[in-house]
């Protein structure tokens, strides 16, 4: 699922990506495609 507010952390370390996804109600991040954060 694309989570727009997390796009800005795509260049940061994985734990920060997971933290952003969790803050939006997801379990963690799966990947960043072209600057778009994908959470699951």
Curated annotation (Swiss-Prot):
One of its GO terms (biological process) is killing of cells of another organism. One of its GO terms (cellular component) is extracellular region. Keywords: Antibiotic, Antimicrobial, Disulfide bond, Fungicide, Immunity, Innate immunity, Secreted. Disulfide bonds join 6-20, 10-32, 21-39. Gene3D superfamilies: Diapause-specific peptide. Induction: By bacterial infection. Contains three disulfide bonds. Hemolymph. Signal peptide: none annotated. It is found in: Secreted. Fungicide. Belongs to the diapausin family. Monomer. This is Spodomicin.
């Amino acid at each position: 699922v694309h989570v727009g507010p997390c796009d800005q952390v795509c260049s940061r370390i994985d734990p920060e990506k997971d933290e952003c996804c969790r803050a939006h109600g997801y379990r963690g991040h799966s990947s960043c495609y072209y600057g778009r954060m994908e959470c699951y």
